């Protein structure tokens, strides 16, 4: 069994990328439930992510989801994150809500739908 010191060393190196949607309203596949204090825009989501990183030291990166985290100036957005001590990480595109993606997006049986997903 690993000692507490060994476990702590591993945890000190642990880095987690949190998804931006984790800082918004949540719910089930049937309904999203509004909550007070939820971020109103991507900049506020990053501010919440910075608080998580401040308290854990392990969540320095935030994965974005487009179109929900779309902003006009990504350089300004990245600087905002950096100023707060976090970075913008993975970019996830929404290739699942469009009706065309009912049978998948980049693996759809219809070549036109696959191409649409790639263009997205």
Place the predicted regions along the sequence by residue.
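N-terminal pre-domain/capping segments
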Residues: 1-120
